[in-house]
């Protein structure tokens, strides 16, 4: 590689390296840095050209499939799992942490009985609508006492995980208050003016909501902090 001096006639070329001066200071002439690869549409890239995941972390270098660790995270339902995977999926895959379904917090103790949590095989649990005095909080207290140090149960205040998506993403100022006795998913879709007659409509409505979530910035802080804390809990260095 050479540096060409175009002010001279004829044009003079010099090998790159030390020995050049710029504005009265000695410099070393180096070849230009390659431009960072252009990101595909929707992909976040740092100033240095590193890809950023939906959770805001640097994407790991591809190192092939991971063997799942014993430690894992449970969530109440399928929509919870899909949202967690959408935002934190790359981080969890790199750490070898599986996300599994409880199908309701009432099943938590039975699931943990089978799993057998220990300090090295940890269980992180995300619970919907865990507020003081609720059934959810009582179950959380019971399992946390029984498997102290091996189980961490955290909850968010939302009645349904849909409400953890910032309402502006679907054109609302706030999520609608659904009266008791009306299924919150049906009621929410009705308030949005979307189809809500059956489970197919609910599945399509959730898919539509999830598609508006680009990164962690589109989620409420009350969910973000809980998920990050659970990931930290199950990925301590000594966990299996």
Label each residue range with its predicted role.
Residues 60-124:
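Acidic, glycine-rich catalytic loops of TOPRIM or P-loop NTPase phosphate-binding modules used
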Residues 142-217:
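Activity-critical C-terminal alpha-helical subdomain
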Residues 209-240:
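Charged phosphate-binding loop/patch that engages nucleotide di/tri-phosphates or the phosphate backbone
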Residues 2, 6-9:
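Short, small-residue-biased leader/transition segments that mark boundaries at the very start
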Residues 106-107, 130-134:
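Short acidic, S/G/P-rich loop/turn micro-motifs used as interaction or catalytic elements
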Residues 47-58, 232-240:
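Short, charged, intrinsically disordered terminal tails
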Residues 10-54:
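Intrinsically disordered, low-complexity, charged/polar segments
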Residues 113-115, 134-147:
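Short, aromatic/basic amphipathic alpha-helical patches
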């Amino acid at each position: 590689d050479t540096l060409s001096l175009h002010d001279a006639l004829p044009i003079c070329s010099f090998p790159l390296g030390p020995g050049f001066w710029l504005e009265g200071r000695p410099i070393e002439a180096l070849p230009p840095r390659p431009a960072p690869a252009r990101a595909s549409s929707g992909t976040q890239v740092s100033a240095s050209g590193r890809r950023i995941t939906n959770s805001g972390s640097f994407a790991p270098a591809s190192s092939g499939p991971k063997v799942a660790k014993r430690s894992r995270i449970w969530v109440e339902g399928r929509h919870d799992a899909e949202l967690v995977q959408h935002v934190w999926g790359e981080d969890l895959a790199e750490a070898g942490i599986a996300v599994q379904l409880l199908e309701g917090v009432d099943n938590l103790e039975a699931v943990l009985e089978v799993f057998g949590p220990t300090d090295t095989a940890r269980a992180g649990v995300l619970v919907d609508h865990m507020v003081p005095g609720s059934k959810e909080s009582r179950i959380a207290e019971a399992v946390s006492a029984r498997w102290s140090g091996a189980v961490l149960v955290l909850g968010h205040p939302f009645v349904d995980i849909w409400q953890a998506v910032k309402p502006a993403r679907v054109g609302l100022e706030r999520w609608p208050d659904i009266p008791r006795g009306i299924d919150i998913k049906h009621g929410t879709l009705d308030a949005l003016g979307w189809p809500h007659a059956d489970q197919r409509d609910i599945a399509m409505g959730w898919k539509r909501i999830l598609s508006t979530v680009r990164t962690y910035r589109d989620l409420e802080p009350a969910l973000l902090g809980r998920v990050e804390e659970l990931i930290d809990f199950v990925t301590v260095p000594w966990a299996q």
